[in-house]
């Protein structure tokens, strides 16, 4: 048995090495495929989505003028969002990772289009494994409160000067401030540097753009009612110093230089529009552009409206088709208006002039698709660790569902979100989900139960679903009991263990099956051989010192049940040769025992060196094969089946006259040459799995 363990260990190491090599190869191949996929995606491009964000630092907010760029319908983690948030904090407001760690509060809120939101602590460094779709995000708001240090006294001495930026007539609300030390004497040169800095960071206007602009100036409005206009292009400064406490606000005005393209721009007509989606209206900040041929028909106008609906609000043709309401209203400068239905394919032949249009209002109310697809929020708690309500279970079609349908969806999200499959659920200590209804009632369902609930329920009545799983580690679910096997007085060391389940009490009948299984597997002794054995029993040693002997040949079992945890070890004892004494005496009188050493892969004394032959003076290779196979099976548990599965099993027989012969034990037939068993000097067996 020791030798079999040695061979098995060597084989396992070889398989591990081979598997490791395959794994590395597969990993490299997968990595290469990923690179190819990435490069392919990069080559073909992704549809992008812009998500607006705001930054509030110490209560001072910034207007929504910037957006975070993501791939449309991309599954991202909160770690990905956090990286982008930290990047814009550093770029826009100069707040580094160290500043965040030392801050009093640092968080960001993800606002979803379904009205829910999720607050994430930037200082925690803990991220859930949930993935979210970028198309579900409406906006992101970032809030940082710097920690009050000793320097706060100096911070209190600072003064905030509000400013506005107007570029080509488009003004920005006063939502940001320039920071100066209170009552500090500064020059207009210092002021200009600050102005140029906010122009670059807020509106992307560089020094080169300022030099090429038609006009670039800023006006300093003082608290005493006076003001001072400074030309940003002049480069000439007065030597006057001003007190920061005297400044009321600063107005920045830039007009970009008109190039040749301005002629084409003049020819274009800009029509402002607004979009009302499910009652939520966006400000009129964008325009529909019409070419230098201002006459257009309503079909072209509808195409432009559908385009901005998709780009601005993500409303596609399919969404419009299922919408309850989808139309736009064209307001003319003469006071008239025209309502056009977006789902209608009938258009009037009238042409309209872009200059006559005052504005366009788009109204969409999603309808039948929203009703056909219902969403129920859910949480997952695994071993007490819960995820927030960030995801929903999606139900399609019929408004009524069964608990069986819900169970399938719950198992699906468990596998997708937390990697818990059917096997893990089967061995879990607890696996349930609770359906909370809007009327305050709730229903707990066991995920491992095979009893079907026939009740049907309306999805609209479900408030939320809480999933709770407590995994029982596989090691704790099973116990391993050491055992020994003694056949005809030859015992094996305690090298193997019986695997028994901890989940329930067991009886001796259950233990019998396990013992018979290892007897057949380890020593090749089946039920028939046990039946004809002289003795077949096993002894159960308990940890409290007691023992129990069980007869393997008996079909009568005590009804006692006991815990696997109480078993210390099991000793199995089998004595074969159950033929009658007369037959045994006859065999012993005829058979002659011949001794010669046998080694396996160079190891000696691992099998018997005594063999009984009926006719030792005339044996063939087939007779020797049979004896060696029997010795391998009884002494080392290497059965004929194992030999058949081996890569190579041969032996070399050495004779006393100096000759030798190679024999393949896997071969069915050997030569019929006769020789004497007493002429054998030794046998060397080589086995390779």
From Swiss-Prot:
The keyword Signal applies. InterPro entries: MAP_dom. Residues 1-30 form the signal peptide. Coiled coil: none annotated. Keywords: Repeat, Signal. PROSITE patterns: MAP (PS51223). MAP repeats lie at residues 45-154, 155-264, 265-374, 375-474, 475-584, 588-689. The keyword Signal applies. Both native and recombinant protein bound to labeled vitronectin, fibrinogen, recombinant osteopontin and fibronectin. It was also shown to be able to bind to a 15-amino acid synthetic peptide of vitronectin. Map could affect the severity of arthritis and osteomyelitis in mice through a T-cell-mediated mechanism and could play a role in abscess formation through a T-cell-independent mechanisms. It could potentiate the survival of the bacterium by modulating host immunity. Each MAP domain contains a 31-residue subdomain that shares striking sequence homology with a segment present in the peptide binding groove of the beta chain of the MHC class II proteins from different mammalian species. This is Protein map.
């Amino acid at each position: 048995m020791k030798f079999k363990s040695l061979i098995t260990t060597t084989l396992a190491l070889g398989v591990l090495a081979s598997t490791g090599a395959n794994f590395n190869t597969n990993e490299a191949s997968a990595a290469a495929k990923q690179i190819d996929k990435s490069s392919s995606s990069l080559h073909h491009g992704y549809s992008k989505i812009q998500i607006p964000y705001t930054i509030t630092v110490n209560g001072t907010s910034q207007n929504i003028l910037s957006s975070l760029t993501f791939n449309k319908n991309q599954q991202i983690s909160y770690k990905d969002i956090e990286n982008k948030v930290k990047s814009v904090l550093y770029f826009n407001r100069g707040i580094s990772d160290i500043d965040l760690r030392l801050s009093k509060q640092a968080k960001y809120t993800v606002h979803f289009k379904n009205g829910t939101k999720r607050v994430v602590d930037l200082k925690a460094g803990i991220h859930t494994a949930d993935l979210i779709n970028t198309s579900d995000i409406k906006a992101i708001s970032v809030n940082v409160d710097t920690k009050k240090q000793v320097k706060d006294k100096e911070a209190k001495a600072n003064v905030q000067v509000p400013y506005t930026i107007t570029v080509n007539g488009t003004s920005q609300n006063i939502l940001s401030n320039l920071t100066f030390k209170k009552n500090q004497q500064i020059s207009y040169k210092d002021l200009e540097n600050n102005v140029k800095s906010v122009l670059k960071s807020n509106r992307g206007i560089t020094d080169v753009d300022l030099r090429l602009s038609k006009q670039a100036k800023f006006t300093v409005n003082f608290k005493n009612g006076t003001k001072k206009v400074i030309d940003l292009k002049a480069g000439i400064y007065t030597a006057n110093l001003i007190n920061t406490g005297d400044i009321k606000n600063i107005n920045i005005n830039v007009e970009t230089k008109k190039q040749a393209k301005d002629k084409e721009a003049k020819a274009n007509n800009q029509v402002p529009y607004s979009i009302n989606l499910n009652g939520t209206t966006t400000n009129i900040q964008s325009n529909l552009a019409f070419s230098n041929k201002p006459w257009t028909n309503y079909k072209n106008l509808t195409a432009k409206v559908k385009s901005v609906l998709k780009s601005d609000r993500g409303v596609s043709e399919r969404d419009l088709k299922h919408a309850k309401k989808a139309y736009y209203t064209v307001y003319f400068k003469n006071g008239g208006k025209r309502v056009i239905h977006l789902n209608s394919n009938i258009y009037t032949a009238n042409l309209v002039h872009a200059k006559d249009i005052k504005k366009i209002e788009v109204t969409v109310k999603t309808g039948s698709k929203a009703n056909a697809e219902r969403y129920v929020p859910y949480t997952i708690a695994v071993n007490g660790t819960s995820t927030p309500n960030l995801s929903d279970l999606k139900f399609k079609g019929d408004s009524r569902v069964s608990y069986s349908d819900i169970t399938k969806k719950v198992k699906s999200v468990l596998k997708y979100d937390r990697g818990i499959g059917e096997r893990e659920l089967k061995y879990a200590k607890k696996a349930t989900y609770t359906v909370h209804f809007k009327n305050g009632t709730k229903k707990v369902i066991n995920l491992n139960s095979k009893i079907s609930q026939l009740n049907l329920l309306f999805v609209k009545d479900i408030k939320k679903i809480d999933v709770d799983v407590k995994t029982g580690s596989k090691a704790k679910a099973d116990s391993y009991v050491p055992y020994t096997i003694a056949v005809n007085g030859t015992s094996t060391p305690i090298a193997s263990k019986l695997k028994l389940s901890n989940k329930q009490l067991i009886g001796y009948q259950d233990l019998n099956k396990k013992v018979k299984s290892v007897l057949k597997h380890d020593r090749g002794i089946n039920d028939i051989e046990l039946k004809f054995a002289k003795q077949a029993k096993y002894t159960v040693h308990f940890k409290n010192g007691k023992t129990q002997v069980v007869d393997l040949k008996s079909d009568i079992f005590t009804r006692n049940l006991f815990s696997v945890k109480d078993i210390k070890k099991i000793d199995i004892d089998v004595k074969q040769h159950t033929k009658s004494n007369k037959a045994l005496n006859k065999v012993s009188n005829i058979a002659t025992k011949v001794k010669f050493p046998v080694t396996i892969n160079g190891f000696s004394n691992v099998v018997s060196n005594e063999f009984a032959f009926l006719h030792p003076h005339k044996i063939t290779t087939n007779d020797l094969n049979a004896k060696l196979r029997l010795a391998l099976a009884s002494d080392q548990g290497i059965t004929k089946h194992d030999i058949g599965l081996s890569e190579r099993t041969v032996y070399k027989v050495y004779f006393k006259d100096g000759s030798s012969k190679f024999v393949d034990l896997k071969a069915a037939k050997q030569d019929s040459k006769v020789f004497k068993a007493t002429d054998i000097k030794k046998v060397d067996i080589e086995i390779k799995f």
